[in-house]
């Protein structure tokens, strides 16, 4: 059967995967060495600084290895970074009957958006060497503005999400985006003349890409061994275009990977949709894999 609901696959299911894997160890294979910590945090999509970032910065956790919530058919060892910007385009509001007296912020924002979207054609030419990760890309996920139908919009705000492959330099990516926005704003010519646009760019999030550490091999090998046995097929080590909290551990020299319950792809999970789902058989099998992995690592 399947279980449906928002966050079922990303990542409530792994609360169960990890918790019941630990319970299995307690019941039938108590560890002879080491300790296990379960970190249930909720701020990954906002950078992770209030959850794992806070725990790490305060020295409240110092693990040797870590596994974060993921899917069942691959073990993820690298992932994209993410830059999010909020762009405020300020024009001058006016009555629609006398549009010449204002500056249309929406037209200006549209001009800037066209310049940003054109970047995606260039990003297609930039290829990552990490299997599972293709190229950078840009998305505008939210836009708001205007006050009424009969009013020339005086202000428009939109939010940009720029995914960065591991080979990219985040500072250079941000500088290039800001320059594109600035150049587009400067080149905008209001159809009826008028003042120039005022544009403000604010960074909302900068999450670095994750690159694998050599010390992750015990985790990778154990997951591939037991995953292959339980699922009956090879479990490859790949990168993912997502960004996660794992980078916060890896940036502090703690080897980490991503593995858990779920389908082969994010698309199959219907993540972020009302019909997000997980196959319960994947949940059961991933829990078995994690229990075996922990048993190996804690008894070696």
Describe each region flagged by the PLM.
Residues 1-9, 67:
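Catalytic-core environment of secreted peptidases
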Residues 4-5, 32, 62, 154, ...:
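Residue-level preference for short coil/turn positions at secondary-structure junctions
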Residues 6, 39-41, 238-240:
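Structural motif
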Residues 11-84, 298-299:
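Acidic/histidine-rich catalytic neighborhood of metal-dependent amide-processing enzymes
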Residues 71, 76-78, 83-300:
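Metal-dependent amide/peptide-bond hydrolase catalytic core
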